[in-house]
Design a protein with these regions (language model features):
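Short, charged amphipathic alpha-helical "coupling" segments at sensory-output junctions
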Residues: 40-42
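Histidine- and acidic-residue-rich, metal-dependent catalytic cores
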Residues: 8, 20, 44-229
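Intrinsically disordered, low-complexity polyampholyte segments enriched for Lys and acidic residues
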Residues: 2-3, 15-16, 22, 31
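Serine/threonine-rich low-complexity intrinsically disordered regions
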Residues: 9-12, 22-25
Length: 229
């Protein structure tokens, strides 16, 4: 699998002073059907002001691209079938697309969310899957998007799926999503060290995350640490 990103994301200012942020990045060489589908859906836009444009670029678009990169490494590590690996990367590139339907004031909030706000944010998984289905994406992609916040112990959302009942691709995205959030940080939480990320993943292995995927991610993080010394 090629380890290159093709940027389909732009921020174009309109006459109304708002920016339209394309929310997808293309991965690999752009020749696969999923990348073409991604490219054809460049009109998935989020109108925002200049400050929000920078925020969405970093915490939404760039995050999805990084998660896709981690998913590609997991797929390679476990020798995932090429077709499934392609689906995994496409789903990862779009896993948070439902957040375009979440009010910016909630999505961008720096403090702790209220219970009501958290319920709103939780809707992004279902909204994203529904939206992608309506735009012609296959069930393999939409199901991974819908279930990437399920927990291995069954305490996640939206359907409370447990263990192997959670689609494998969703289980992989869940770990990669969390790893990136900790390694890079969020707007409301600073990044932490690789050791702390590993400790946190292992602490939640078997409860929040698939233990097998966690073990692979730990190996990847350790290898990255060696490479970047």
């Amino acid at each position: 699998m090629k380890d290159s990103m093709r940027l389909f994301t732009t921020m174009a200012r309109g006459e109304d002073g708002l920016y339209s942020v394309e929310i997808t990045r293309g991965y690999c060489d752009g020749k696969c059907v999923f990348c073409r589908r991604c490219y054809e859906n460049r009109d998935i836009l989020k109108p925002v002001n200049s400050y929000e444009a920078d925020f969405y670029e970093e915490h939404f678009v760039n995050h999805q691209a990084r998660v896709a990169g981690l998913c590609a490494k997991v797929a390679e590590y476990i020798a995932l079938e090429q077709k499934k690996a392609t689906v995994l990367i496409q789903a990862a590139l779009l896993h948070d697309i439902g957040k375009i339907f979440i009010p910016s004031a909630v999505f961008m909030k720096k403090g702790r969310l209220t219970p009501e706000e958290f319920e709103v944010v939780k809707c992004h998984a279902v909204l994203g899957a529904f939206y992608l289905k309506g735009r012609g994406f296959p069930a393999s992609v939409t199901e991974a998007v819908k279930h990437h916040h399920e927990r291995y112990d069954g305490a996640g959302y939206p359907d409370g799926l447990k263990g192997d009942h959670i689609p494998l691709l969703a289980r992989i995205i869940a770990v990669c999503d969390a790893a990136d959030a900790m390694l890079v940080g969020r707007h409301y939480r600073a990044a932490i060290s690789r050791k702390m990320v590993i400790d946190e993943l292992l602490r939640n292995s078997g409860s929040q995350f698939d233990p097998d995927v966690v073990n692979v991610m730990v190996e990847i993080i350790n290898e990255e640490a060696v490479v970047n010394v």
